[in-house]
């Protein structure tokens, strides 16, 4: 028997599908940033923790997803697709994978929207978190740098699989049945990466002049937010990305298991960037603001890996023009463009050299192995010790020859001459005379007093002790041979024992009376 979907259930279902689509885009894009994500669990979820997952939304990605959806939801014949592609510094591009969220006409009228659909969408989103990290594009995203970057594009409509080449494979993340149709989340990914293996990349300037990590906090929280050169300022444009609280509706539904409806604090520690109206014809990078350098009007402060800043040119260099409708998501791991905060004159020189991009490999290795103490203070490399380094990198620590010479484990001190009575038998004249050195240089006598030893003359090791006491000798009380005494001998001695008892019967009676 088919049941009609109530207006409240329909409203909840549309809200579930809407935010599932937005969270799907966030999960896919964040999995291609090239960085590991570590999120701590919270016992008090906020109203934006949809599907019981604490996924920090990137405002720019949410803005692009909402712009692609344009108020419509994935339905029969309307699919939402997220295309992941690769672009090199020479301008060559290659599509890597396409994620598709679609719906078919198979309905489940008996399923409950308020509980079952919501929980199954949560499980599907968790499956997506795992699947996005097993496809080949994830490994490429972890290695992106100045040679290539990973781009993404969101579109709504028919799935375009022509760019994946021949022999691409598909994987279905999962399906969730609803009263209006069955949601299906799948992925088609490229397996022929010959383009990457045959081309020899050269050291070139970065593709984008502004390369920012999505997960680095602002080094100067008190400074005013900066704006990329492709965007207008907030006063000129008058349009800004909405914050997390504004971009997401509170997760309130008709059932009691929804998260609380109050947002206590902001989920993100950085200020959102501003979208410029005058650059609509240009492809713009998805970046996060970190602070404005007032001294250099054409340079931007970019947060580095160590919490420092790097001065990067605001205008794109060679190969900076990205494809329209594609957004770059990249943070370089190369040490030539990531330096510590200029706290001294030497650090300032390092920042200027790294911004030019002409650092030698030796300088790169030296920068990597410089130990940082405190926030951004550099410790001289000759002060690096094995104990101050992490365990996996202790083997790469520079060895100090003077310390090795004084180490008693490397060069043990000379042992004193022993007076053991066995000394003469162990060291013969022939063995010591042939070497030309003293006898104690060839042999080191150690007073060996093991445990479980009977005496000092006959030492006993643990194995001998264990074997000896594992099979102990029989007790003397158990060694009497009772079989030698026969029953006849017992009967012959019985009259004698009775006669002795009758003779001393009075003594026995007196003893018994004393006991009473």
Swiss-Prot record:
Phosphoserine: residues bearing it: 354-355, 360
GO BP annotations listed: autophagosome assembly; mitophagy; negative regulation of cell population proliferation; positive regulation of autophagy; response to mitochondrial depolarisation
Gene3D superfamilies hit by this protein: HORMA domain (3.30.900.10)
Any single Gene Ontology cellular-component annotation: cytosol
Residues covered by region (Important for interaction with ATG101): 127-134
One Pfam family linked to the record: ATG13
InterPro entries cross-referenced by the UniProt entry: ATG13, Atg13_N, HORMA_dom_sf
UniProt region (Disordered), positions on chain: 336-359, 405-438
Keyword set, alphabetical order: Acetylation, Autophagy, Cytoplasm, Phosphoprotein
Motif (LIR): 443-446
Cellular compartments annotated: Cytoplasm, Cytosol; Preautophagosomal structure
Residues with N-acetylmethionine modification: 1
SS bonds (residue pairs): none
GO molecular function, one term: protein kinase binding
Post-translational changes noted in the entry: Phosphorylated by ULK1, ULK2 and mTOR. Phosphorylation status depends on nutrient-rich conditions; dephosphorylated during starvation or following treatment with rapamycin. ULK1-mediated phosphorylation of ATG13 at Ser-354 is required for efficient clearance of depolarized mitochondria.
Biased composition (Polar residues): 341-357
Subunit structure comment from the entry: Part of a complex consisting of ATG13, ULK1 and RB1CC1. Interacts with ATG101. Interacts with ULK1 (via C-terminus); this interaction is increased in the absence of TMEM39A. Interacts with ULK2 (via C-terminus). Interacts (via the LIR motif) with GABARAP, GABARAPL and GABARAPL2. Interacts (via the LIR motif) with MAP1LC3A, MAP1LC3B and MAP1LC3C. Interacts with TAB2 and TAB3. Interacts with C9orf72. Interacts with RB1CC1; this interaction is increased in the absence of TMEM39A.
Record function comment: Autophagy factor required for autophagosome formation and mitophagy. Target of the TOR kinase signaling pathway that regulates autophagy through the control of the phosphorylation status of ATG13 and ULK1, and the regulation of the ATG13-ULK1-RB1CC1 complex. Through its regulation of ULK1 activity, plays a role in the regulation of the kinase activity of mTORC1 and cell proliferation.
Record remark on domains: The LIR motif (LC3-interacting region) is required for the interaction with the ATG8 family proteins GABARAP, GABARAPL, GABARAPL2, and MAP1LC3A.
Entry's family note: Belongs to the ATG13 family. Metazoan subfamily.
Name the record gives this protein: Autophagy-related protein 13
């Amino acid at each position: 028997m088919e049941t009609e979907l109530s207006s409240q259930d329909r409203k909840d279902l549309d809200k579930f599908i809407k935010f599932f689509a937005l969270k799907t885009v966030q999960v896919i894009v964040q999995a291609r940033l090239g960085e590991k994500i570590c999120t701590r669990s919270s016992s008090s979820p906020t109203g934006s923790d949809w599907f019981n997952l604490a996924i920090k939304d990137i405002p720019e990605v949410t803005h692009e997803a909402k712009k692609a959806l344009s108020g419509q939801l994935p339905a029969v014949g309307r699919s939402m697709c997220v295309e992941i592609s690769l672009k090199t510094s020479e301008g060559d591009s290659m599509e890597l994978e396409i994620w598709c969220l679609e719906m078919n006409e198979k309905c489940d009228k008996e399923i409950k929207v308020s509980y079952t659909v919501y929980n199954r969408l949560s499980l599907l989103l968790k499956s997506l978190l795992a699947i996005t990290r097993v496809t080949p594009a994830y490994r490429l995203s972890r290695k992106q740098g100045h040679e290539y970057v990973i781009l993404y594009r969101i579109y709504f409509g028919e799935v375009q699989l022509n760019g994946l080449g021949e022999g691409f494979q598909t994987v279905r993340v999962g399906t969730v049945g609803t009263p209006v149709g069955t949601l299906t989340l799948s992925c088609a990914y490229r397996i022929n990466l010959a383009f990457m293996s045959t081309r020899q990349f050269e050291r070139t300037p970065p593709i984008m002049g502004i390369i920012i990590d999505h997960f680095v906090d602002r080094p100067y929280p008190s400074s005013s937010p900066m704006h990329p050169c492709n965007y207008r300022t907030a006063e000129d444009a008058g349009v800004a990305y909405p914050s997390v609280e504004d971009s997401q509706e509170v997760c309130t539904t008709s059932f009691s298991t929804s998260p609380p409806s109050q947002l206590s604090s902001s989920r993100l520690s950085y200020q959102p960037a501003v979208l410029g109206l005058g650059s609509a014809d240009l492809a713009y990078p998805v970046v996060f603001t970190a602070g404005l350098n007032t001294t250099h009007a054409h340079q931007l402060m970019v947060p580095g890996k160590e919490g420092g800043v790097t001065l990067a040119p605001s205008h794109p260099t060679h190969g900076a023009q990205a494809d329209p409708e594609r957004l770059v998501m990249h943070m370089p791991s190369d040490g030539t463009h990531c330096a510590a905060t200029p706290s001294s004159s030497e650090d300032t020189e390092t920042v200027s050299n790294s911004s030019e991009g002409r650092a030698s490999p030796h300088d790169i290795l030296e920068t990597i192995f410089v130990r940082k103490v405190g926030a951004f203070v550099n410790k001289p490399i000759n002060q690096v010790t094995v104990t101050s380094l992490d365990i996996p990198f202790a083997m790469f620590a520079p060895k100090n020859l003077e310390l090795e010479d004084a180490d008693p484990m490397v060069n043990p001190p000379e042992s004193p001459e022993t007076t053991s009575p066995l000394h003469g038998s162990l060291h013969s004249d022939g063995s010591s005379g042939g070497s030309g050195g003293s006898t104690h240089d060839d042999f080191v006598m150690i007073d060996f007093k093991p445990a479980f030893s009977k005496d000092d003359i006959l030492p006993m090791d643990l194995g001998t002790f264990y074997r000896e006491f594992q099979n102990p000798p029989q007790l003397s009380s158990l060694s009497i041979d009772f079989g030698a005494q026969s029953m006849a001998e017992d009967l012959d001695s019985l009259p004698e024992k009775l006669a002795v008892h009758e003779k001393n019967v009075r003594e026995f009676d007196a003893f018994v009376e004393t006991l009473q």
